[in-house]
Amino acid sequence: MSVESMVQGMIDALTDALGDAAKHDKGNSAAGTRVRKAMQGAKAAAQNVRAQVQGDKNSR
């Protein structure tokens, strides 16, 4: 998988979380849980991107 597609996947996931973030700001607690879950996924995806970039760098 390319780094570009990995980053695009992160962007798509975070864009999807915007709706829940707005609901959370209006007081919806369940939406806040979904936002936290999306952020945890973004953290994991960012770690994968970092590992991929480092691996690519080391192999060049």
How does the language model describe each region?
Residues 14, 18-21, 39, 43-46, ...:
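A structural signal for well-ordered alpha-helices, especially hydrophobic packing surfaces
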